[in-house]
């Protein structure tokens, strides 16, 4: 089955690669319109997936990732329309020159070809990835988790219907609908047809792809995100950022998981933090150094375990620990972070610049929430993933990250001397 899907995707990629921007945008607008027109069908499929998830004991955090509502679906359709307004990178000349040997040489952006994406309980990924791949002239093979197979099937059917209406191959967007895990292993070996693989899920999925795939893999999306509260902060402003970073959408990979507080302000700041987090329904997981300042406060407090520093909560839970200074904060992030998104809250320009230089994450913030690590917030449109590696892309992966380049040489019946 996958062999045929791969062949069909590769054939479709050749057709997509030569489409004009107008043709691609027409397809995307048709997809957005049909997503809204067929929303009842998609939401009904999602409701069945969600019912199974509850019955199987899925955590509330993962249920939130799985859930589609009319509002969320409308926002996704709006994101697709936003992709139309983005500049098409395909065909752009990156650089060029006239060489001494008479060759006019240029480097031009081209599609990758076929992209494979493996993801878990995230039905929005189906549409986000499909829209970005289509805009950049790439075909895509999607493998969502078993938790979302009804939602994904309904969504891909709508996308393929839109493609057919626009005279484009339905095989440009395909989904592996079977929940059989063996098909994941087969996809990882489909390097004859698939040019890049992107896993979006937990650490286990990323490890499997890194170790087993014969296709180049882009890993990331696991976000153990930190905020360091320096001793120079404005308490009220800092608490607002911390609250938003934690509770705006706790299940997101860019939500705050560990708060590092300069020990010089612990006696004044942590009681205020307790009030803020209590109002937001956040449970604090305190280190031994932070516990005395939080015990007896209004927020629920438990002792942090060392393993908590290395994992995503994806829920209304927050690790809190004290650090002596900026050096200690950076050291903690280096030891426990995932190079996703980390922030400093400070009024010291010197400390801000040091933090930016020394924290080696894909996105680093000064006096801003980690929640900004998002393709839409970065002006990239819907993202295909957030890469925490350094090759071939880093951070939110927008359109350019779904292209490569080719060298093109022009001559006048030119031969090499």
UniProtKB/Swiss-Prot annotation:
InterPro entries: Ald_DH/histidinol_DH, Ald_DH_C, Ald_DH_N, Aldehyde_DH_dom, G-glutamylP_reductase_CS, Glu-5-SA_DH, GPR_dom. Disulfide bonds: none annotated. SUPFAM superfamilies: ALDH-like (SSF53720). Keywords: Amino-acid biosynthesis, Cytoplasm, NADP, Oxidoreductase, Proline biosynthesis. Pathway: Amino-acid biosynthesis; L-proline biosynthesis; L-glutamate 5-semialdehyde from L-glutamate: step 2/2. It is found in: Cytoplasm. One of its GO terms (biological process) is L-proline biosynthetic process. CDD domains: ALDH_F18-19_ProA-GPR. It is an enzyme of class 1 (oxidoreductase). Its main location: cytoplasm. It catalyses: L-glutamate 5-semialdehyde + phosphate + NADP(+) = L-glutamyl 5-phosphate + NADPH + H(+). It comes from the Bacteria. One of its GO terms (molecular function) is NADP binding. The keyword Oxidoreductase applies. One of its GO terms (cellular component) is cytoplasm. Its EC number is 1.2.1.41. Coiled coil: none annotated. NCBIfam families: PRK00197.1 (NF001221), proA (TIGR00407). PANTHER family: DELTA-1-PYRROLINE-5-CARBOXYLATE SYNTHASE, GLUTAMATE SEMIALDEHYDE DEHYDROGENASE. Belongs to the gamma-glutamyl phosphate reductase family. Catalyzes the NADPH-dependent reduction of L-glutamate 5-phosphate into L-glutamate 5-semialdehyde and phosphate. The product spontaneously undergoes cyclization to form 1-pyrroline-5-carboxylate. This is Gamma-glutamyl phosphate reductase. It comes from Pectobacterium carotovorum subsp. carotovorum (strain PC1).
């Amino acid at each position: 089955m996958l062999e045929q899907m791969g062949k069909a995707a590769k054939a479709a990629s050749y057709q997509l690669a030569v489409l004009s921007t107008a043709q691609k945008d027409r397809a995307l607008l048709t997809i957005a319109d049909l997503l809204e027109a067929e929303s009842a069908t998609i939401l009904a499929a999602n409701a069945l997936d969600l019912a199974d998830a509850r019955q199987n004991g899925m955590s509330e955090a993962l249920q939130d990732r799985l859930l589609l509502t009319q509002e969320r679906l409308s926002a996704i359709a709006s994101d697709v329309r936003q992709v139309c307004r983005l500049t098409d990178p395909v065909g752009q000349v990156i650089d060029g020159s006239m060489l001494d040997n008479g060759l006019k040489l240029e480097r031009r952006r081209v599609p990758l070809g076929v992209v494979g994406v493996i993801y878990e309980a995230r039905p929005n990924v189906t549409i986000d990835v499909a829209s970005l791949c289509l805009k950049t002239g790439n075909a895509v093979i999607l493998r969502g988790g078993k938790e979302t197979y009804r939602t994904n099937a309904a969504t891909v059917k709508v996308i393929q219907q839109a493609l057919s209406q626009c005279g484009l191959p339905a095989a440009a967007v395909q989904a592996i609908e079977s929940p059989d895990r063996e098909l994941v292993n087969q996809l990882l070996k489909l390097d004859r047809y698939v040019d890049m693989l992107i896993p979006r899920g937990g650490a286990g999925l990323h490890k499997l792809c890194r170790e087993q795939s014969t296709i180049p893999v882009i890993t990331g999306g696991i976000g153990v995100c930190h905020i360091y509260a320096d001793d120079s902060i404005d308490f009220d402003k800092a608490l607002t950022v911390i609250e938003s970073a934690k509770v705006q959408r706790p299940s997101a990979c860019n939500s705050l998981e560990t708060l590092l507080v300069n020990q010089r302000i612990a006696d004044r700041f942590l009681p205020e933090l307790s009030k803020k987090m209590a109002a937001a329904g956040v449970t604090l997981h305190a280190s031994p150094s932070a516990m005395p300042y939080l015990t007896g406060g209004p927020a629920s407090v438990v002792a942090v375990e060392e393993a908590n520093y290395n994992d995503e909560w994806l829920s209304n839970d927050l690790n809190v620990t004290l650090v002596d200074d900026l050096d200690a904060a950076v050291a903690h992030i280096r030891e426990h972070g995932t190079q996703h998104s980390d922030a400093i809250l400070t009024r010291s320009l010197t400390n801000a610049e040091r933090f930016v230089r020394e924290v080696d994450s894909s996105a680093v913030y000064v006096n801003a929430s980690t929640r900004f690590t998002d393709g839409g917030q970065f002006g990239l449109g819907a993202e295909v993933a957030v890469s925490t590696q350094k090759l071939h892309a880093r951070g939110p992966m927008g359109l350019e990250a779904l292209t490569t380049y080719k060298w093109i040489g022009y001559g006048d019946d030119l031969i090499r001397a």
